[in-house]
Amino acid sequence: MGLAGLGVGALAGALALTPGPKVLGQAETLLEARSPNQRHNAKLACEAIDGKVIKPGEVFSFNKTVGSWSRDKGYRRAPVSFNGSLIDAWGGGVCQTSTTFYNAALYAGMELVERHAHHFCPTYASPGRDAAVAYPNIDLQMRNASEHPIEVSAKVEGSRLKITLIGRAAKPAITIQTRIIDQQSPMLLNQGSGDSPWLRSPGKPGYEVETYRITPESKVRLSRDRYPVMHRVVQWSNGS
């Protein structure tokens, strides 16, 4: 699957011709379909990692950098995926920031240490390209494997969440490839009885995917993820 089909923009340049700072990796995701509170929380997480300098050999921990998503830090309650269901919880929406950072880090050549997929595939990223976090136990960790520091720029620009990783390391071009092994379409399920319908679940396809990072020298499998199908459920009841 090409980059255009991933919904994540990225820049990963060829070998640098100058020793000055340059973009090593860049990714962006769209906030248009997110709730106001999800946008707010994603922006707060961006502010927490913006300006972070990752030293050579250092492991960047998203949870340690962002910290808890508590009310006293300004986070709001918003929909979050929990055990296969959507519930309102403090910090809902932060996973969009971790997902965007993950994609930028892949293009920057950072080494994957820890990453978790969501139970269901989120709308803002393609299958295999998401990175779920839940403070403090479910983390995203990436190691700076280069000999130079990497600086994080994380911004919300209109409806776009954009993360850029900047450094002096020379690196070859990197391609991220996602291979869909299996895909399941959601079914329409009617539940209850009556004359008044309401949409209980919008439904999402299910996927099994493998994701690879490709350089001129190698092709490395990053992950194999399974996302179950979420059926479209219409609940019927008697109108009041």
Protein language model regions, located:
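N-terminal Sec-pathway targeting helices
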Residues: 1-7
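Well-ordered beta-sheet/strand-loop patches within structured domains
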Residues: 7-240
